Amino acid sequence: MLKSINHICFSVRNLNDSIHFYRDILLGKLLLTGKKTAYFELAGLWIALNEEKDIPRNEIHFSYTHIAFTIDDSEFKYWHQRLKDNNVNILEGRVRDIRDRQSIYFTDPDGHKLELHTGTLENRLNYYKEAKPHMTFYK
């Protein structure tokens, strides 16, 4: 039986740039650095960075694949401004109904998509039940 997510690992082209991003911008706690690796605790998760300089990264922006972190509604403006102030690549995101809460989509220095979201799974399911009758829901 799966218990939980153990860790998330990102391939990065420049370890120092990524350490700066995850520590100084996203406020992750740096736990370990090595020649080509760094570990963080971020939002209760183990985030691992492994430097791999020769990995193609040009098509990653076409995918909707991303990792979302929860933030409070009251912190939305703070985080949006923090990302802007640090010249983070903020993405336009999708058009969203306010019942689906607020999100900020952005990328790390290697183009990995991240999201800061103010909603919960329960919020999303309730919104979809109300607004999307074509969907099938299971218990």
From Swiss-Prot:
Gene3D superfamilies: 2,3-Dihydroxybiphenyl 1,2-Dioxygenase, domain 1 (3.10.180.10). GO terms for cellular component: cytoplasm. The active site is at 115 (proton donor/acceptor). Its EC number is 2.5.1.-. Signal peptide: none annotated. Residues 4-119 form the VOC domain. Pfam families: Glyoxalase. Its cofactor is Mg(2+). GO terms for biological process: response to antibiotic. Mg(2+) binds at residues 7, 66, 115. PROSITE patterns: VOC. Transmembrane segments: none annotated. NCBIfam families: Fos_BSH, PRK04101.1. Belongs to the fosfomycin resistance protein family. FosB subfamily. Homodimer. HAMAP family: FosB. Metallothiol transferase which confers resistance to fosfomycin by catalyzing the addition of a thiol cofactor to fosfomycin. L-cysteine is probably the physiological thiol donor. This is Metallothiol transferase FosB. It comes from Staphylococcus aureus (strain N315). The lineage of its organism: Bacteria, Bacillati, Bacillota, Bacilli, Bacillales. The gene is fosB.
